[in-house]
């Protein structure tokens, strides 16, 4: 049996025709799933009983099981703990701002990158998520929170570009008008930096937004907090961004976590200006969230000083207003966990 949520539109048409069902039946089923949020074939009443039985024998619709839902008392940010079919768990987040809802979704169970400041990698890496497990997070968020997701960021658990094929297919399904119908420019892929995959993303023609988690401006410092940097240097990352912009023309968001007396010095800001020269970028400055006790948030004056140096050199930036910190739903705080 196949999970319908793993299949793109053309694949579903082929699968349905293989079992003797017309193409328009695909549209009917997708309307039930993606528009009406009905996930049992038996309840799809514009299909005959015979067709419902046939579909139940050949396919299943796999939504993650909700284990826990926490809602921030500060800003309504909602964190979801899901159990997958094999018993593994992942987390997703819904962010609320200016009448819009952004879903922050996971792409892996755990994470192999193991950034020092991130909770996800501390629980180890298990496996990549399937296409359906990525897409179903949006459906499950909408179902359980009674909301409509308008923006999606691949910024939850895992490194999206290390699950490249499934992420690409899931983006196509999010954007498909017969499925979730989310505008392509409302989808952002956030990566710690896999240069060849950044270029491949540009060459895919999908035209999604890209965010690079840079966090340090020298290999010496980045090696200390992002082990993967020992394989892909800062220079290689910046080169891949230049290639990305040559191909797409899109502005790139640079994520920069600020850690007190580590990467928050004026010389770090000046080096960042030099690195980004000639690129069209927007820089998010993120005071580190409490995960690793050896790292501390910078002083407010250090934050403002860093921001001022960037702005004086023509780089648009902001100090990110963190959401969901009271429920551990902010940047770097998602982890693989079980309910006690």
From Swiss-Prot:
Its EC number is 2.1.1.192. It catalyses: adenosine(2503) in 23S rRNA + 2 reduced [2Fe-2S]-[ferredoxin] + 2 S-adenosyl-L-methionine = 2-methyladenosine(2503) in 23S rRNA + 5'-deoxyadenosine + L-methionine + 2 oxidized [2Fe-2S]-[ferredoxin] + S-adenosyl-L-homocysteine; adenosine(37) in tRNA + 2 reduced [2Fe-2S]-[ferredoxin] + 2 S-adenosyl-L-methionine = 2-methyladenosine(37) in tRNA + 5'-deoxyadenosine + L-methionine + 2 oxidized [2Fe-2S]-[ferredoxin] + S-adenosyl-L-homocysteine. It is found in: Cytoplasm. GO terms for cellular component: cytoplasm. Keywords: 4Fe-4S, Cytoplasm, Disulfide bond, Iron, Iron-sulfur, Metal-binding, Methyltransferase, rRNA processing, S-adenosyl-L-methionine, Transferase, tRNA processing. PROSITE patterns: RADICAL_SAM. SMART domains: Elp3. Reaction proceeds by a ping-pong mechanism involving intermediate methylation of a conserved cysteine residue. Specifically methylates position 2 of adenine 2503 in 23S rRNA and position 2 of adenine 37 in tRNAs. This is Probable dual-specificity RNA methyltransferase RlmN. The lineage of its organism: Bacteria, Thermotogati, Thermotogota, Thermotogae, Thermotogales.
């Amino acid at each position: 049996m196949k999970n319908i949520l793993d299949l793109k539109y053309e694949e579903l048409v082929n699968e349905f025709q293989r079992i003797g069902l017309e193409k328009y039946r695909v549209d009917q089923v997708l309307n039930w799933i993606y528009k009406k949020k009905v996930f049992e074939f038996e309840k799809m009443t514009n299909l005959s009983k015979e067709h419902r039985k046939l579909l139940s024998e050949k396919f299943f619709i796999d939504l993650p099981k909700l284990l826990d839902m926490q809602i921030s008392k500060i800003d309504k940010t909602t964190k979801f703990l899901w159990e997958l079919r094999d018993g593994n768990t992942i987390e997703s987040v819904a962010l609320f701002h200016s009448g819009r809802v952004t879903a922050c979704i996971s792409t892996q169970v755990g994470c192999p990158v193991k950034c020092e400041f991130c909770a996800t990698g501390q629980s180890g890496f298990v496996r990549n998520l399937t296409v359906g497990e990525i897409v179903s997070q949006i459906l499950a968020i909408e179902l359980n929170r009674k909301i409509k997701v308008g923006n999606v960021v691949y910024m939850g658990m895992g490194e999206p570009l290390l699950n490249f094929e499934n992420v690409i297919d899931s983006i196509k399904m999010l954007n498909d008008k017969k499925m979730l119908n989310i505008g392509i420019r409302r989808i952002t892929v956030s990566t710690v930096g896999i240069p060849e995959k950044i270029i491949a993303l540009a060459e895919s023609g999908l035209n999604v937004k890209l965010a690079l988690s840079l966090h340090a401006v020298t290999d010496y410092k980045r090696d200390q907090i992002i082990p993967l940097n020992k394989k892909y240097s800062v220079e290689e990352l910046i080169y891949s961004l230049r290639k990305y912009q040559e191909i797409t023309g899109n502005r790139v968001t640079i994520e920069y976590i600020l850690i007190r007396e580590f990467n928050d010095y004026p010389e770090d800001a000046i080096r960042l200006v030099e690195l980004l020269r000639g690129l069209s970028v927007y820089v998010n400055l993120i005071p580190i969230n409490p995960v690793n006790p050896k790292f501390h948030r910078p002083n407010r004056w250090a934050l403002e000083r860093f921001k001022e140096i960037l702005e004086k050199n023509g780089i648009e930036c902001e100090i990110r207003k963190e959401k969901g910190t009271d429920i551990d739903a902010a940047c770097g705080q998602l982890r693989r966990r079980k309910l006690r």
